Design a protein with these regions (language model features):
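Secretory targeting signatures
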Residues: 1-39
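Long, non-catalytic protein-protein interaction scaffolds
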Residues: 39-765
Length: 766
């Protein structure tokens, strides 16, 4: 299986779907696909498959915004330095007299260390530096976190001020038109399909507005389904479309727990994105003939849905507004995240308009031969790439192919997970975040995955993914904000060369950067939890120190600044600009450009000017302004489930905790060494029951109660206080052990609560 067509080199068209369906002409027009009717059945019952040849269709779209990368210009010229065993060559040691022996040893050995803290926000650490007149070490973590805050805020603002109304009006319009179709159609079969559409959109309308009155014809279906959504218990087929749907996905999480409005929006979009109108299902317990009939029924619903977009209702008297609203929502979220992994409304409308000459004509709309052509054409369209539901390892992913009204998006990390778990990698049911980092180029991540390499086909699959993603060009990597975020931070996985500061040339710094990438990736998954398509395993001295030091990664700052510019231009082009947010994003963009220049000077041993020193002196207040208030930015700690294993009923949770304090021995312009203090991510990975998918609030409580899992043991190379043997490594391996998985009472299989580590007092100056 190859990755999405986004890999084919089309210039940064994040919503581009350019697909040419190549049709093999059989030489016999109207080839028999299957008998239209069963013998002795009424003409209102679909059976087998109707006649029809697929049509050649081309789908195109336009880019939302362009990406243009800032250039960097520097020469690596930093002299190496060592730390005296008694730290006597650190010119501001008096400011850190509280450091215990293990912290001092870490500075001597590898120039820096990190410790957990009780700080709730990154900016708090830098503001305390200002208060205590301590030099700030400006980390890549701090600006990545600032970008996350603004990305999340922008998405939240747009959802509440624009999309909440859009999706409500669109759902109610589709209910009204579907009921009109139900009353107008003469065929009992097609009336039943219109009724199911009315129920489908009534669920969405009721989730959006609890006070909305459900129409009488579909009341029973709708309230039964709402019961499953509210209980969020897991997989069931006991609802009106009889698909096996994972209702645990309806637990609001991410930023969608902030307000009741966002909770309702989350459930509404989740409903519209998870249910498929499939073209070739293979459902359990059904014969091939029955599955073919189900494909025809669901595709018939899709045909009526396409027609409904152009029908008037009392909400929209024209035939253009519904599709315009859908496109505004879809295109904007595609800009933030990615294009749909499943076939979209636009793609189905293209097929619909190519097949039906007069869609207003009900007789033609119900034409069985045209429906057969529709099914054949849709089956020849692009396939999904990410398994996101219950699929047996003996089945093709194409059993999920079909229309989803607001399909979840193809994101590369979910694709990596789907290609590195069962059935692509036999019996590996849970992936690891390190999988993503290894594919993105981290040799250290690959080394840390040694215990996974015994899985059959794991190394082969990993090498294939490395080659695939290694061949991507700039246009591929910058097709959306999500992709560009990955592109920006993967620069940090490059191993530093001679000429970088000594602290960057240590093995421990490579671990620090890997932790940074895991932290920002977790924030990315948290922010897009509603839209990103989640993967599923298939079943089965006397001198005074300078005011600060910028982590010298100029290429990273250039890429993140370019991403900010792309985001600004994309939102402005759609009139989605919020004044306060825009001002803060512009400030982050400008700050990143300044950090790029400062880090280029640091690497080239060029003195900073007074303006640049002033910037570092005030970095706490600047970052605090960008992050916003506690209510806007929230606690830095967050959690997101990124993969589901239906067999064990577990999800893989990725989380960041409170920001850690990092102390680094850095050089000044006079080749002297001083300690600078900054903030960095903490990162956690653990399995959790799918019926209890964690919210941020539940995760915060675990942190407060010190019942959170421990960080992975390899982070102990630079984080003081991590135990020698991580509970996570043992429990993660247990989840992937078939014998252990069958014995859920096994100690290693249960979620392990770590011991509390009392090192946080070191994070605060005395």
């Amino acid at each position: 299986m190859s990755p999405r067509g986004q890999f084919e080199g089309k210039s940064n068209e994040f919503i581009t779907i350019v697909i040419t369906i190549i049709i093999a002409v059989s030489g016999v027009s109207g080839a028999l696909i299957g008998s239209l009717f069963r013998p002795n059945q009424s003409a209102d019952s679909f059976v087998d498959e109707p006649f029809g040849d697929p049509l050649p269709i081309r789908f195109e779209s336009q880019p939302f915004a362009d990406y243009e990368e800032y250039e960097t210009d520097f020469t690596l010229n930093v002299s190496s330095y060592d730390i005296n065993s008694d730290l006597s060559n650190i010119i501001n040691l008096d400011s850190f007299s509280y450091l215990p022996e293990n912290a001092r040893n870490a500075i001597v050995d590898h120039y820096f260390f990190a410790v957990p803290s009780n700080f709730k926000m990154f900016a708090d650490i830098y503001c305390m530096n200002d208060d205590y007149e301590l030099p700030s070490f400006v980390t890549s973590d701090s600006v990545l976190h600032a970008y996350h805050v603004l990305y999340d805020l922008a998405l939240r603002e747009i959802e509440e001020t624009h999309f909440m109304n859009h999706i409500g009006n669109l759902s109610r319009h589709m209910v009204n038109v579907s009921l009109d179709q139900y009353n107008l159609l003469e065929s009992d079969l097609w009336r039943a399909l219109a009724k199911k559409n009315a129920a489908f959109f009534s669920v969405a309308a009721k989730l959006h507005d609890p006070d909305w009155t459900v129409p009488d014809p579909v009341t029973g279906w709708v309230y039964q389904t709402l019961h499953f959504i509210e209980n969020a218990g897991g997989f069931t087929t006991d609802w009106f479309m009889n698909q096996r749907l994972d209702f645990s996905q309806f637990i609001p999480r991410g930023h969608y727990t902030r307000t009741e409005s966002l909770k309702r929006f989350f459930k509404t979009i989740m409903w519209l994105s998870r249910v498929a109108f499939r073209v070739q299902p293979d459902d359990d317990g059904l014969t091939a003939e029955q599955n073919a009939e189900r494909a025809e029924n669901e595709t018939g619903q899709a045909v009526l849905l396409c027609r409904a977009f152009e029908q008037p209702s009392h909400l929209f008297i024209d035939g253009e507004t519904p599709l315009r609203l859908w496109r505004e929502l879809y295109d904007t979220t595609s800009f933030f995240v990615s294009t749909s992994d499943d076939l979209t409304v636009d793609e189905y409308l293209t097929i619909f308009n190519a097949i039906y000459d007069d869609p207003v004509n009900i007789v033609e709309l119900c034409n069985r031969t045209k429906l057969g052509t529709f099914i054949a054409t849709a089956r020849e369209s692009r396939s999904p790439q990410i398994i996101s539901g219950w699929v047996w390892d003996s089945q093709s992913i194409n059993v999920t192919k079909g229309l989803r009204f607001m399909g979840q998006r193809f994101v590369p990390d979910s694709y990596m997970f789907s290609e590195l778990t069962h059935a692509a990698v036999k019996y590996r049911m849970m992936p690891k975040a390190l999988d993503v980092m290894a594919v993105l180029g981290s040799q250290r991540a690959w080394d840390l995955l040694d215990d996974q390499k015994d899985y059959l086909n794991y190394t082969t699959q990993m090498n294939r993914l490395k080659e695939t993603y290694g061949d991507l060009n700039l246009s591929n990597w910058t097709q959306s904000l999500y992709w560009s975020w990955l592109y920006s931070f993967k620069t940090l996985l490059d191993e530093p060369e001679l000429g970088h500061p000594s602290f960057m040339l240590t093995d421990q710094w490579i671990d620090k950067q890997l932790t940074t990438c895991l932290g920002t990736w977790t924030e990315l998954r948290h922010d897009t939890i509603l839209y990103a398509k989640q993967s599923y395993s298939q079943t089965y001295g006397a001198s005074y120190p300078p005011p600060g030091y910028v982590e010298p990664v100029p290429k990273f700052y250039a890429k993140l600044a370019s991403l900010c510019r792309m985001m600004l231009q994309g939102l402005d082009s759609r009139g989605l600009v919020v004044d306060d947010f825009t001002e803060r994003l512009v400030r982050l963009h400008d700050l990143l450009r300044e950090f790029q220049v400062i880090s280029e000077k640091e690497l080239s041993q060029t003195p900073l000017n007074a303006t640049e020193w002033s910037l570092l002196e005030n970095i706490g207040g600047i970052l605090a302004h960008i992050e916003g208030t506690y209510n806007e930015g929230g606690r830095a700690a967050l959690v997101a489930d990124v993969h589901t294993d239906p067999m064990s009923g577990k999800v893989l949770e990725e989380a960041t905790g409170n920001p850690m304090v990092i102390l680094v021995a850095v050089p000044n312009e006079e080749d002297k060494v001083f300690l600078a203090r900054g903030a960095m991510y903490s990162h956690y990975e653990f399995a959790w029951p799918m019926s209890e998918r964690l919210t941020d609030e539940a995760w915060w409580q675990m942190l407060e109660e010190e019942s959170a899992p421990s960080m992975d043991d390899w982070m102990g190379s630079f984080v003081l206080g991590i135990s020698e043997t991580s509970d996570l490594s043992a429990s993660h391996n247990a989840y992937n052990d078939p014998e252990m998985r069958r014995n859920s009472s096994s100690k290693a299989y249960r979620n392990v609560m770590p011991i509390a580590i009392d090192v946080r007092k070191m994070a605060k100056p005395t």
